Amino acid sequence: MKYFISATPGPMPPTPEQFDTAIEWLEGRVDDGTFDCVYGFLEGGGFGITNADSHREALDLMAEYPLFGMVTWEVRPLLEFKEGLDTVRAKLAEAQSAMAG
C-alpha cells in the first residue's frame, strides 16, 4: 500500500545537526526503497510516497523520523491510478438518477 506523507515544519526550527540527520535518514529510506520519492516544498518541509503494509507501519515509519515531534504531519493512503473508478462512476450515475427524479 502506498501513502502520501507530508511534513510541515513547526514553530521550533531544528538545529543544523538535527537537519543533517533528518536528510540522511530520508536519503537512506529512498535508497532502501521505503520511499519511492521525496520532494521538498519551497517554503520548507516536503513529502514522500512510501510503501507500507498497514497504517500502523506508516505510523511507525513516521515515528522513526528524526524530526518527528517538530513537524506537522499529513498522511493519506493512495490508490493506483484508476483503482476504484468503477465504484465512483457507479455512485455518480446513482446520484444523477436520483436528481432526475
Question: Which ranges hold each PLM region?
Answer:
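Conserved, structured core segments of small domains
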Residues: 1-101
